[in-house]
Amino acid sequence: MLKPNRVRAAFREGRPSFGVYARIPSTATIELLAHAGLDFVRIDLLENHIGPEMLRAMIQTAHAEGITPFVRVPAVDPQAIRMVLDLGASGVIVPEVESAADVAAAVRAAKLPPHGARRVGLTGLDGHGRVAPDEYAAWASEHVLLGVQMETPGALRDMDAILAMPGLDMVLGGRGTLASHLGVPGQRDHPKVLEAEARLMERARQAGKIISVTYLPVRDPAQVEPVRDWVARGIHSVALGLDADFVHVYRRLLAAVAPAASGERQS
């Protein structure tokens, strides 16, 4: 059934929302993330393969457990955008947009009229007929969010046109991709990358968009401090890495309790 989008709710209440990217194709992972107290999960189809049936099950589990499900699609693909929303996602993340035209195509695919041209296909979110179409449309207009990752030179050049676009709800960085474009591949925390991201986030904030950054504090505890800094600066949403990052916790634990054994396993 229809539930509020926790990212939208947090934004309106003036507090940050927190979540992670999910790459493990498992409903159990979604359940655990919900019980960790996170607000959202971004199921990742860009750097992972999750089939439609598992994707639908993961989205349904998220709704049942009270964690808001987003899906990151592989590209600016209207068919993929419509598919994940018809499966029940409360939001879609579109990576590597190159231009205002890319974002306009995403808006058309993700949004109902008047901003878009999405044709609604309900797959259980309507309670199999218990929710009237007009009620679903009102809910979707309010709670289904479209976010784009502005991580390419083209997107940064078209920044003003993109940020002025009706129907775009959220702007995300992408420091890994941005680092490559700025000539410092692999250096997500290079000053040039951080400066470009901060400039983008401030412009997006001024445009009234939800702004979101991604850090990896489970993988690298030193990144806790930058997250705290963003929170103090009023960031709206933070992705705290990946579901699979738990492996780094056990690597550190193993190194602490049995350093020799840890070294043998890594060699």
Walk through the language-model features, giving the residues of each.
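Expand to "…catalyze enediolate/carbanion chemistry for C-C bond making/breaking, isomerization
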Residues: 1-267
